[in-house]
Amino acid sequence: MLEYMEYLEQCFAKNSQWDYNNLYEHVLDSSASILQFKIPHGFKFSVSSSSSPYNYNSISFENRGKGRLNGSLAYFYTTQELSNYKTSKNIPLQDVIDSYRLVNIPKNDRSYTDNEESKRPWLLYGRMYLPSQSMEAMAIKRLTANTQLMLKGVNILNPTPTPFNNKLTSLSFYLQSNYYKWSREAIFLSSDALFGLRFLYNFGNSTNPQCTPSIDSNNISTLSLGTELWYGAMNMTPGLSTTLRYTSFSVTGNPLTFTLACNPILGSVSTTYSIKTNVFTTLCSKFDFNFYSYESDLTIGCDLWRFGNNEDVPDSNPTPLPSKERELFIPLHDHQLVFPEQEKAKTISNEPKDYESDLLLKFLEIQGIKTARQSVATINNFTQKIKNAPFTSALKLNTSLKNHTVNLMWEGKYNDFLLSTGCSLNLDLKRPNVDGFGLQIQYSS
């Protein structure tokens, strides 16, 4: 489950129309949310509030079972009003629980209007951990409608302090460009003098006005190819990885995502397949293989969403039209049979014409458009049901053949509180035990 400050950053991105799904860093989020979720350890309780539409603060207490109580203080400020912000009482669980990502790359790039030109938003975030007094901070500044600068910093106590250096400081710089067709990130990490470059390109989208317009502004399928390059100036170490992502909606409206990731330096290849079979269920699998060690692993997982007892459960399958209505529904008002000028000239002569073939081709074109429109309506109906469904809880489960562990996590809402609890079960035949267990409670106003 997203923490309070992570949720605020998500609200800021949605308000400023910044799509994180179009960045290489988040290309594997659909599978990672189910197969790599983090189980809370110990007990953690956080209380957050909003003093204004621009200022937010949070305080949390945590006990990891070592007899010591830790805490943190956080502050968040933005120049843009977060109109989509909701408290823990009113927030939908879809907004705070990581699950399948409905990737919808826009068909055009965003541009500022004259009124928005002077309103390039930015945010500031800071957190202090107690009693260690370690600190972390983040700043995001939107430079243009499709470019932003992100700065992250961490200051922690040095585990081996010296008279001249008792703290460790690390800064990270991100220059991100996000367009409908591609995205790019230039990264620098000060701790190891590490330089990085990420790039993601989307195939199959076109805004050429001469092309036939799409049936709907939503993309039924998207193929993306991305790569990242790293170079450590201090240790002279390179890094390289590339990922292919295909996300689509089937004819029944169920979204699916397939990814293929490769790291040639480490010799690792991994594939993931995720599909949302209905509004309540998502299935996911991942296969890893290493060419150097010949080791492999298979990980499978799922998440199950639940409604309240008194809530109206939406039907996961849209109601189809009656057969007679489907046969008669042809949008002729949008498509007319038009003969070119040269055909009109030929009609003056007495040459035989094959008008039946022309009419058949036009009819098939109309039927194809009709089928496409029905598919898009089905997809939109399925998507809206996911966004508007009154979920009350979600259960996540994954297991790995190599590690012999089963991870369980339950996330939900009780009154005005957001709850997250889970455990990790070790199924070793010699010594089966519980490796980890925790509970996290959040409240915001």
Swiss-Prot record:
Subunit composition and interactions: Component of the ER-mitochondria encounter structure (ERMES) or MDM complex, composed of MMM1, MDM10, MDM12 and MDM34. Associates with the mitochondrial outer membrane sorting assembly machinery SAM(core) complex.
Species this protein is from: Komagataella phaffii (strain GS115 / ATCC 20864)
InterPro entries per the UniProt record, alphabetical: Mdm10 (IPR027539)
Entry domain remark: Lacks alpha-helical transmembrane segments, suggesting that it resides in the membrane via beta-sheet conformations similar to those predicted for other outer membrane proteins and porin.
Gene name of this polypeptide: MDM10
The entry's keywords: Membrane, Mitochondrion, Mitochondrion outer membrane, Transmembrane, Transmembrane beta strand
Coiled-coil annotated spans: none
Protein name as catalogued: Mitochondrial distribution and morphology protein 10
Membrane topology: Multi-pass membrane protein
